[in-house]
Curated annotation (Swiss-Prot):
One of its GO terms (molecular function) is UDP-N-acetylmuramoylalanine-D-glutamate ligase activity. The keyword Nucleotide-binding applies. Cell wall formation. Catalyzes the addition of glutamate to the nucleotide precursor UDP-N-acetylmuramoyl-L-alanine (UMA). This is UDP-N-acetylmuramoylalanine--D-glutamate ligase. It is found in: Cytoplasm. ATP binds at residues 112-118. Its main location: cytoplasm. InterPro entries: Mur-like_cat_sf, Mur_ligase_C, Mur_ligase_C_dom_sf, Mur_ligase_cen, MurD. Pathway: Cell wall biogenesis; peptidoglycan biosynthesis. It catalyses: UDP-N-acetyl-alpha-D-muramoyl-L-alanine + D-glutamate + ATP = UDP-N-acetyl-alpha-D-muramoyl-L-alanyl-D-glutamate + ADP + phosphate + H(+). Gene3D superfamilies: Mur ligase, C-terminal domain (3.90.190.20), Mur-like, catalytic domain (3.40.1190.10), NAD(P)-binding Rossmann-like Domain (3.40.50.720). GO terms for cellular component: cytoplasm.
Length: 464
């Protein structure tokens, strides 16, 4: 799209907002940045250097004098400024959509409730490995790494952009068309933003493939009940090539052009009547990368790589060297016979349940944060089976105590530091301390990364 001379309002002056404001300015647009909170000193200086006018502490009517608006993913559709723009008929786009207008590289878009970051990181490693041989670059952008807008102008046609996409980012995508789209799974999350309806949340996720054509590929998790049913009834209407992945030997995959599965302790790529063994389980599963969910992440990455013609050697090399992602069931230390695990990225109960299933043995669980409207009783079975004691923190601690009180030993802590101290006192040799909040972090921390770093520091500071 030609944006030269267009008036553009950018709502939000954090990383993606700053990046898209600079991109649009470089492309000749007249940009105005509006921030509800305070703009940092570095960001203010950068905007002034670029001669981009801005405001902070609220959104004035200036944002309504615009040809279109780029909206931060953190701003919900019910926000007054968004409603005012919609009433005036102002088009709203996400930073991802705008960056896509200027992208020359091949694109792999990855979304889902859980597993996005691990899958995106693994896909990036595969293409990074292959790129060293075939002389192209792989970029990791979007919800992971740097904003898409900050790197898009350096991307060449032979390069690959691996983009992790949240539902919030997909809301503002209208023409975005990845060469390969990946959906890792869909379970209830962020329902407070989607009127409490899983259907609304899922429909937003499906936007990732909405504009794909016959030359493109859609990869999805066929073990996910919602995705299985959705594509069983819709795949004949989609023009793109569809590649399911799943655990087990599945005869129903014979109807697809290709499929990736985990069968007989190895990853197998099926293409028609031909099957290829990609890698043995023992060559990629390890202490820092284990569990059914990580097998699924590896299957998704293999499917995405094969969709763009990557050979098995590069795939195997990347998988063998992959040791997981920070804050995802990350081993921190062993103290007095007990392992301490940081799973701060578990921001919903599905991720919490996966951690409980994956980490072996009994454990002391530290959980809680800002509740997303979850029903914690849904995972009562695995909690009863695996959790010896629960230390609840954050805004959700009373709800957690009510859900699991009488089922396990439940304690309440006013801070993460207190929770770590309680866990230290409760854990027995041979058990694990698992920090897997099952909630968002914004009640007590900047984000899940800040939360995870604080847990790791508190844990490493403990003395034997």
């Amino acid at each position: 799209m030609d944006v030269a001379g267009k008036k553009v309002a950018v709502l939000g002056a954090r990383r993606s907002g700053m990046a898209v404001a600079e991109l649009l300015s470089l492309k000749g647009a007249s940009v105005f940045v509006s921030e509800l909170g305070t703009i940092g000193a570095h960001e203010s200086a950068r905007l002034q250097a670029l001669r981009i006018p801005f405001e902070e502490g609220g959104h004035s009517d200036n944002v309504l004098c615009t040809d279109f608006c780029v909206i931060s993913p953190g701003i919900p559709g019910r926000a007054p400024v968004v409603r005012a723009m919609l009433e005036k008929g102002i088009p709203l786009f996400s930073e991802i959509e705008v960056a896509y207008w200027f992208c020359k590289a091949r694109i792999i878009g990855i979304t889902g409730t859980d597993g996005k970051t691990t899958t995106a990181t693994l896909v990036h490693r595969i293409f990074e490995t292959d790129g060293m041989t075939h002389r192209y670059r792989a970029f990791s952008v979007g919800n992971i790494g740097q904003p898409f807008s900050s790197r898009v102008l350096t991307m060449r046609p032979e390069d690959v952009a691996v983009i992790e996409l949240s539902s919030y980012q997909l809301e503002g995508c209208c023409t975005f068309r990845p060469d390969v789209s990946v959906i890792t799974n869909i379970t209830p999350d962020h329902l407070d933003r989607y009127e409490g309806e899983l259907h609304n949340y899922a429909q937003t996720k499906y936007r990732i493939y909405a504009h794909q054509g016959k030359e493109d590929t859609l990869v999805y998790n066929d073990d996910d009940p919602l995705l299985h049913d959705h594509f069983a009834s819709n795949r004949e209407t989609l023009p793109c090539r569809i590649v399911p992945f799943g655990i087990g030997c599945k005869p129903e995959h014979a109807g697809f052009a290709a499929a990736v599965r985990f069968c007989d302790h190895r990853i197998v790529f099926d293409a028609g009547a031909k099957s290829e063994n990609i890698i043995e389980a023992e060559d990629f599963l390890k202490r820092s990368f284990r569990g059914r969910h990580n097998i699924a992440n590896a299957l998704a990455a293999v499917a995405a790589a094969r969709a763009l013609g990557i050979g098995n050697e590069a795939i195997r090399s990347a998988l063998q060297g992959f040791s997981g992602v920070e804050h995802r069931q990350e081993f921190v230390r062993t103290l007095d016979g007990s392992d301490w695990i940081n799973d701060s990225k578990a921001t919903n109960i599905n991720a919490l349940s996966q951690a409980l299933e994956t980490v072996p043995g009994r454990m002391v669980l530290i959980a809680g944060g800002r509740d997303k409207g979850s029903d914690y009783r849904e995972i009562a079975g695995i909690v009863r089976k695996k959790v010896a004691a629960l230390v609840a923190i954050g805004e959700a601690r009373e709800k957690l105590c009510a859900a699991y009180g009488g089922m396990v030993d439940v304690r309440s802590a006013n801070s993460l530091e207190e929770a770590v101290s309680l866990a230290r006192a409760l854990v027995e040799p041979g058990q694990t301390v698992l920090f897997s909040p099952g909630c968002s972090s914004f009640d007590m921390f900047e984000d899940f990364e800040d939360r995870g770093r604080q847990f790791k520091k508190l844990t490493t500071d403990l003395r034997s």
